[in-house]
Amino acid sequence: MIYDGQISPYDVIDLVYTQGKLQSDAVYEDLRNGAITPYNYIIREIRSLTITPAMLALDPYSGALCITDVKTGKVKALVTYPSYDNNMLSGHVDTDYWYWLNNDDSQPLFDVATQALTPPGSTFKLCTSVAGLAEDYVDPDTFIFDEVYFEKVIPSPRCYIAPASHGLVNVSTALEGSCNYYFFEIGYEMGLDESGQYNSLQALNIITDYAKQLGLGIKSGVEIRESEPRVSTTDSVRTAIGQGTNGFATVHMARYVNTVAASGTNYQLSLIDRVEDKDKNVILKVEPVITNKVQLSEDEWDAIHLGMRLVTQTGTASSFFTSLNATIAGKTGTAEENLYRSNHAAFVGYAPYEDPEVSFACMIRNCDSTSYPGDTLCQTLRYYFGEITYDDIMKAPVENTISGFHSE
């Protein structure tokens, strides 16, 4: 907007004064007399984190990340952005700060991680894979040819790489390349009744059942307020690739991918390990809660896990996690919700691939590319696995993320 002249130098000066971020009169004069352009000034201040996305309230400015223990469902990290400083609200509440929190356009009091229902995009294809395998519509060795346009329904959806084709794919390679056509076929086959007629509602009921079994279509279980997840109620063919009316918060996505990483063991998520009294005596120990077990054969789970591993090796996220030593399995997803705003992006997965320890979900609204949640998770996991330190993160320059993911 600055570069295109939609915002004047005076708008920029007003912005930084309002936010209290204009460091000196010298900078003020440089902006006024043109010694530094507003565009270069804003870019410099964003890279130094003097001005943050939340301050601008321009897309993308909100997102969330959740990391869980695959073997227990315990939440290891839950981050929402924009956020606020708890210290300013502890004991004595700073009234000016409280007023600002309630009136800021970026809504820092809104918990994006637990309440922002966001379309999942192609991350939903893991659910469709499980449903298709469990109900015997496909098996790990079923190959479907990507005919690009799915003409069994009108209007006909297409594979995102149209006019190109993924060719013959099975569940593993369909996940690797995020082949829409493969999942269109499953969403359609689930809806065929005994007479061979397509009934979308029949398929949607199956998809909803497995979304709930996987922990996606039910609340996560965290001990704070969360929104009710929404599984799509329209068009099973498009729902099968994550479109339709699907809407999930990051904690819902985290429980879902934790279940996949745990080969079907659906743990309720929890933020609490134990409760102690003032003398450090444990008065409550919160044990893992298993809600259900999704029944697939070992070969079927292996096929899904292989597909997720291929995503980060040769698929839609192949160029991104190269700086991470730990082996990653995951799935990318982008989703359009508003024609006038950028797409949402998500990445879900687990690590290490060989023996899952943690699973994770990151969703950034209106950021357009899965490279952004991917980069966020890459750096977070490098820290978790001890490959970089806190100081490394804090001292690193803020640069553009390396875009390597496809939008699908």
Residue ranges and their predicted role:
Residues 281-283, 289, 376-408:
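Short, gly/Ser/Thr-rich active-site loops of penicillin-recognizing serine hydrolases
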